[in-house]
Amino acid sequence: MRTEFLWGVLALLCQQTLVSGHILGRPSSANDLAQLKSLLERFEETLDEVVQKEDLEAYYEDMNQDPKSSQTSQGWDQEGNQEPLISEKAQPLTEGKTVNQRSRLQDLLMATRKRTSGCFGARMDRIGNASGLGCNSGRG
């Protein structure tokens, strides 16, 4: 009975040492809390700055994707107005083509290229043997 009591006291003493040694077990001073609060405020400010920068970048990218508002397309339009090379009757037909070509070029530039192998997945049957699901072997 006495040994059980000693083991119990030893276990409680170890537990007390572990709890008091942990940072959450210590009493916090007002200075520590103030420092944590200021750190949190600075973190929130930097997050706000990052969000604002991302919003500006997204806005800038959206403005550049619009062919009517981009500076390069305005410059091209001004050059086209200064030097008419095509007769006025053929111009409406070619304007549609240039707008179409310009939009296709912008789509090519803005599109994210995906490298596909023609397979939408692969399945492992056994170790070392892989069978492709949905693979087009003719297109490879």
Swiss-Prot record:
Residues 66-81 have a biased composition (Polar residues). It is found in: Secreted. It comes from the Eukaryota. Cleaved upon secretion to produce the functional hormone. Residues 59-102 are annotated as: Disordered. Transmembrane segments: none annotated. InterPro entries: Natr_peptide, Natr_peptide_CS, Natriuretic_peptide, Natriuretic_peptide_atrial. Disulfide bonds join C119-C135. One of its GO terms (molecular function) is hormone receptor binding. Its main location: secreted. GO terms for cellular component: cytoplasm; extracellular space. Residues 22-113 form a propeptide. The record marks R113, K114 as: Cleavage. Keywords: Cleavage on pair of basic residues, Disulfide bond, Hormone, Secreted, Signal, Vasoactive. Residues 1-21 form the signal peptide. Belongs to the natriuretic peptide family. Hormone playing a key role in cardiovascular homeostasis through regulation of natriuresis, diuresis, and vasodilation. Has a cGMP-stimulating activity. This is Natriuretic peptides A. It comes from Oreochromis mossambicus. The lineage of its organism: Eukaryota, Metazoa, Chordata, Craniata, Vertebrata. The gene is nppa.
